[in-house]
A protein has these predicted regions:
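Juxtamembrane intracellular "pre-TM" segments in multi-pass secondary transporters
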Residues: 2-9, 201-237, 423
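Helix-loop boundary and gating motifs at the non-cytosolic
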Residues: 3-60, 232-271
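A membrane-interface helix-boundary motif in multi-pass transporters
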Residues: 45-46, 164-187, 377-396
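Helix-to-loop junctions at the C-terminal end of transmembrane segments
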Residues: 65-79, 281-295, 379
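Structural signature of the two symmetry-related core transmembrane helices
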Residues: 82-96, 297-312
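Helix-loop junctions at membrane interfaces in 12-TM secondary transporters
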Residues: 98-111, 314-326
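Glycine-rich segments within core transmembrane alpha-helices of 12-TM secondary carriers
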Residues: 142-164, 361-371
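Multi-pass alpha-helical transporter architecture, strongest
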Residues: 188-199, 390-424
C-alpha cells in the first residue's frame, strides 16, 4: 500500500533540498569563481587547482575528526537539534560570506569553514532519520530526500546562472553577480530548513550522567568496540568505504576527466544538469522498489551498475558518450547513497544513531579523500587519467565482494534469531500443555456439603 510522506518526513526531506544547493555550487560555480579570483591575484592555474583541492581535503579531515565526537555528544537527550542548528547556521552564513572576500586565500578560509558547517550538519541530519520515520519507511524517505535534493537544488542554481549570464544586461559585473548567487543559495538553504527546525523532536537518545570530555571519549571507545564486534555493521562500513569511494570520485572528478578526453565546458555543464534531473525520479523509484525487494539486493545492483559505468568511461572519447554516462550516473547516484543511508540506519541502535552516523561519516569522508588521491597518483604514474578510472572500477569490485559477505552474515543471523524464536515458542507451548495436563490431586478431595475428605492423596 502506497503511503504519502507525513509532515515531519516532508520537513526532513526539505533539508536535503536546502543543503544540496550548496553541494551543487561546490561542483560548479565555486571552482570557476575561485580560479578567476586566483588568476587576478597572480596565482597560476595549477596552483589554484592545488589550493582548492587542499581546502576541500582540510575541511574533509576536520569533519572526519570531529564527526564521531560530535555524534557521541548529540546522542544525549535533546542535544541533536541544537548541534544540527549550529552547524547549519555556520554553513548558511558561510555560504553568504563567500560573497565578501577579494583575496583568493581568504576566500578559501571562508570556504573551509562553510564546508565544515555543511558536512557537520549532515551528521546530525542523517541520524535524524530514525526519529522522523519508521524502519519500514526509511528506504523510501531517505530516497525522497536525495531525489528532491537533486531537483530542488536546480532552482537556485538556474536562478544563479541566469544572474551570472545576464549580468551585462542588468549592468553589474560577473563578480558581483556570482557574489549574489552565493547569497541566493544561502537564503534558499536557510528558508527551506525552517520547518524542520520548528517541528523536529529527538525521540531516541542515551541517558548520560556527565558531559565531560573523558566521558565522551569513553563512550566513543565503547561504540567503536561495539561496531568491531558487530559483524553486520562492521562489514557494511568496510564495504561502504570501498564502493562509496568509487561513487564520490566519479562525482568529484567527472568534470576533470571529461575535459581530459576533450569534452567542451558547455557539454560538461549541461551533462551535470542532466544528471541532477535524471537522479530525481530514479531515486524515488528505487525507494519504492525497496518496499518490494530487499534493500541489500538493490544496493548490490547499484554497485554493479557503477562498475559498468567506470568500465564504460575507458572508451569515452565523444560528447554524446559523456551524456550517456551522465544519464546512467543519474539513474544510480541518488539510489546508492539513499539506500546506503537507510540500510545503515536500520541495522544500528536507534538511541546511538548520532554516534554511529559519526563513524559512518568517517568512512564516507575517508573514501572521498582516498579515491581522489589514488586517481591522482595513478594518473601521474601512468600519464593517463584512464589509469585512475581502472582504480575506481576496482573499488567497486572490492566493495561488492565485501557487501555480499555482509549480506550473507545478516541472513545467517536472521535465520539463527528465527530458529531461537521458534524454539522458545515451542518450549512455552509444551510447558503450558504440561501445566494443563498435570493432575495435582486436589479435585474432589472433599465434599463441600459435609467437608468429609474422600481420601488423602499426599
Amino acid at each position: 500500500m502506497k503511503q504519502k510522506l507525513n509532515k515531519l518526513e516532508k520537513y526532513w526531506v526539505m533539508y536535503d533540498v536546502g543543503n544540496s544547493a550548496f553541494a551543487l555550487l561546490v561542483s560548479t560555480i565555486i571552482p570557476i569563481y575561485f580560479k578567476n579570483m586566483a588568476a587576478g591575484n597572480g596565482i597560476s592555474a595549477s596552483d589554484s587547482t592545488a589550493y582548492l583541492s587542499y581546502a576541500i581535503s582540510i575541511s574533509t579531515l576536520i569533519v572526519a575528526i570531529l564527526g564521531p565526537v560530535l555524534g557521541t555528544v548529540a546522542d544525549g537527550k535533546n542535544r541533536k537539534k541544537p548541534l544540527f542548528t549550529l552547524f547549519m547556521l555556520i554553513g548558511v552564513l558561510g555560504c553568504a560570506a563567500l560573497a565578501l572576500p577579494k583575496s583568493a586565500i581568504l576566500f578559501l578560509v571562508v570556504f573551509v569553514i562553510t564546508k565544515v558547517g555543511f558536512s557537520g550538519s549532515l551528521i546530525f541530519y542523517d541520524s535524524m532519520l530514525v526519529d522522523v520515520t519508521t524502519d519500514e519507511r526509511m528506504d523510501d524517505v531517505s530516497s525522497q530526500g536525495y531525489a528532491w535534493g537533486y531537483i530542488g537544488s536546480c532552482v537556485p542554481f538556474v536562478v544563479s546562472l541566469a544572474l551570472i549570464f545576464g549580468a551585462d544586461y542588468i549592468g553589474i559585473s560577473g563578480t558581483v553577480a556570482t557574489a549574489g548567487a552565493f547569497i541566493i543559495n544561502a537564503l534558499w538553504w536557510a528558508v527551506v530548513t525552517i520547518p524542520l527546525l520548528k517541528n523536529y523532536k529527538q525521540n531516541y537518545y542515551m541517558e548520560t550522567k556527565t558531559n565531560g570530555v573523558k566521558e565522551t571519549v569513553k563512550r566513543l571507545g565503547t561504540v567503536c568496540g561495539e561496531i568491531r564486534n558487530d559483524k553486520k555493521v562492521f562489514l557494511f562500513l568496510v564495504a561502504f568505504f570501498f564502493y562509496i569511494d568509487g561513487v564520490y570520485t566519479i562525482i568529484e572528478m567527472a568534470t576533470s576527466y571529461g575535459k581530459d578526453v576533450g569534452i567542451s565546458d558547455t557539454s560538461l555543464l549541461l551533462a551535470l544538469l542532466l544528471t541532477q534531473i535524471v537522479a530525481f525520479p530514479c531515486a524515488i523509484v528505487f525507494g519504492k522498489l525497496a518496499q518490494k525487494f530487499e534493500t541489500a539486493r538493490l544496493i548490490a545492483v547499484c554497485i554493479g551498475a557503477y562498475f559498468l559505468v567506470a568500465v564504460y568511461a575507458l572508451w569515452l572519447d565523444a560528447a554524446w558518450k559523456f551524456w550517456v554516462m551522465a544519464t546512467f550516473v543519474g539513474v544510480f547516484q541518488g539510489a546508492i547513497q539513499a539506500l546506503s543511508r537507510s540500510y545503515f540506519a536500520k541495522i544500528i541502535p536507534k538511541e546511538k544513531s548520532s554516534e554511529y552516523f559519526g563513524i559512518f561519516d568517517i568512512f564516507g569522508k575517508g573514501a572521498s579523500f582516498m579515491g581522489t588521491m589514488l586517481m591522482g597518483i595513478s594518473t601521474q604514474i601512468f600519464h593517463t587519467s584512464k589509469a585512475g578510472v581502472i582504480v575506481i572500477a576496482s573499488m567497486f569490485v572490492i566493495g561488492f565482494v565485501i557487501f555480499k559477505i555482509q549480506s550473507q552474515t545478516m541472513q545467517r543471523g536472521e535465520k539463527r534469531s528465527l530458529a531461537v524464536s521458534r524454539t522458545w515458542d515451542e518450549f512455552e507451548a509444551e510447558t503450558e500443555n504440561d501445566y494443563d495436563d498435570y493432575d495435582y490431586g486436589y479435585e474432589n478431595d472433599y465434599e463441600i456439603g459435609d467437608m468429609d475428605f474422600a481420601e488423602e492423596r499426599f
